[in-house]
Design a protein with these regions (language model features):
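Conserved glycine-rich cofactor-binding loop
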Residues: 18-19
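Conserved glycine-rich Rossmann-like NAD(P)H-binding loop of the short-chain dehydrogenase/reductase
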Residues: 32-48
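The beta1-alpha1 cofactor-binding region of Rossmann-like NAD(H)/NADP(H)-dependent oxidoreductases
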Residues: 62-72, 104
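Substrate-binding pocket helix/loop in short-chain dehydrogenase/reductase
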Residues: 98-99, 103-111
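Active-site helix of classical SDR
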Residues: 122, 157
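Residue(s) in the substrate-gating loop at a strand-loop-helix junction
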Residues: 141
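SDR active-site lid
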Residues: 174-242
Length: 292
C-alpha cells in the first residue's frame, strides 16, 4: 500500500532507474505514494521496475546526454503523470585506470554522462520545478569531497556535479525551487562489485578507514535519499558520518597523496592496472547504446 505523506500523488523523476540506487529509490518513493517517472538505458529493466511499483509510473528509455530526448521525456511525463515536483539526477557511469593511458573518448563519456547529463536533466525539467516550486536532488559522492587516484574522470565529474548543484541552488532559490546534494559512499551495486574485480581499485579502497571502505546496501542509501526528497534537504549524507568528511575535506588530498605514494608503486609492480572500461551492467548498457 502506498503512503499518505507529503509525496502522495506527487510526480517524481528518477534518472538511472533501471538498477542499483535508482531502482531502489524508485521503489522507496513509490512506497511513499509518489508517481514515478523512470529514465535511463535498459528499457526492459526500467519496465520491470515500473511494473513492480504500487503507484502510477512512466518509463522512458533515453541517453541522458541527449537534450532533445530529455525534452520529449519531460513532455511525456507531464502527459502521463502530471507536472513533476521533484527530480533526482542519479544516472552515472564510472571507469578506472591510469589517466596517462586512458581512452579519451571513454574518459569524456564519463564526464558527459555524470556531469553534462545531470545538467541536461535539470535543464529539461527545471520549467516544471519552477511551476511547482519543486525540488531537484543531485546525487553526488564521497568523490565530490575527496578525489582518489585511478578514477580521474569519475572524481572530476562528481566534483563538477557538486559545484553545479551549488550554483543552481543560488540561481533558483528566489523562485521557490530547492536544490539538494546527496553525498553517497560506496554502495553495493553492480558498478562497485565490478570495480572490486580489479586488484588496484580493490586495494586502494581497502586502505580507507573501516567505515569509509564498507559497502552500504542500496535500499539503505535509497531510504536516506527519499527522506531528502520528502524534506527538500539541502544536503544528505549517506551514511551520516560522511558529513565529517565534508568538514575535513581540506585535509583529505594530503592523506590520499601519502597513501598513493606508498601503495601505488607496490600495487602496480605486483599487478599493473589495466583500464576497466565502463564498469558494471549499467556501463555495458551505456556501451551497447552508444555503439548503435
Amino acid at each position: 500500500m502506498s503512503g499518505g505523506g507529503p509525496l502522495r500523488d506527487r510526480t517524481v523523476v528518477v534518472t538511472g532507474a533501471a538498477r542499483g540506487i535508482g531502482a531502489a529509490l524508485a521503489r522507496d518513493l513509490a512506497g511513499r505514494g509518489a508517481r514515478i517517472a523512470l529514465l535511463g538505458h535498459e528499457r526492459s529493466g526500467l519496465e520491470a521496475v515500473a511494473e513492480s511499483l504500487p503507484t502510477r509510473t512512466w518509463a522512458g528509455e533515453l541517453d541522458i546526454t541527449d537534450d532533445a530526448a530529455l525534452e520529449r521525456a519531460a513532455e511525456q511525463v507531464r502527459t502521463h503523470l502530471g507536472t513533476p515536483s521533484a527530480v533526482v539526477a542519479n544516472a552515472g557511469v564510472a571507469e578506472g585506470g591510469p589517466f596517462v593511458t586512458s581512452d579519451p573518448a571513454l574518459w569524456r563519456r564519463v564526464i558527459d554522462v555524470n556531469l553534462t547529463g545531470s545538467a541536461a536533466t535539470a535543464r529539461a525539467f527545471l520549467p516544471d520545478l519552477l511551476a511547482t516550486k519543486g525540488y531537484h536532488l543531485q546525487v553526488a559522492s564521497l568523490a565530490s569531497i575527496g578525489a582518489a587516484p585511478m578514477m580521474s574522470a569519475y572524481c572530476a565529474s562528481k566534483a563538477g556535479v557538486e559545484a553545479f548543484a551549488h550554483s543552481l541552488r543560488a540561481e533558483v532559490a528566489h523562485h521557490g525551487v530547492a536544490v539538494g546534494i546527496g553525498y553517497v559512499n560506496w554502495t553495493d551495486t553492480d558498478m562497485i562489485r565490478d570495480a572490486d574485480r580489479h586488484p588496484v581499485l580493490r586495494e586502494l579502497r581497502g586502505h580507507m578507514p573501516p567505515p569509509a571502505r564498507r559497502l552500504y546496501p542500496a535500499d539503505q542509501v535509497a531510504a536516506r535519499l527519499a527522506d531528502a526528497v520528502e524534506h527538500r534537504s539541502t544536503a544528505v549524507y549517506v551514511p551520516r558520518w560522511l558529513r565529517l568528511a565534508q568538514a575535513a575535506r581540506a585535509a583529505l588530498p594530503p592523506v590520499v597523496l601519502r597513501v598513493a605514494r606508498r601503495e601505488l608503486a607496490r600495487l602496480e609492480a605486483e599487478d599493473p592496472m589495466r583500464h576497466t572500461g565502463l564498469l558494471g551492467a549499467g556501463g555495458e548498457a551505456d556501451r551497447a547504446r552508444t555503439r548503435t
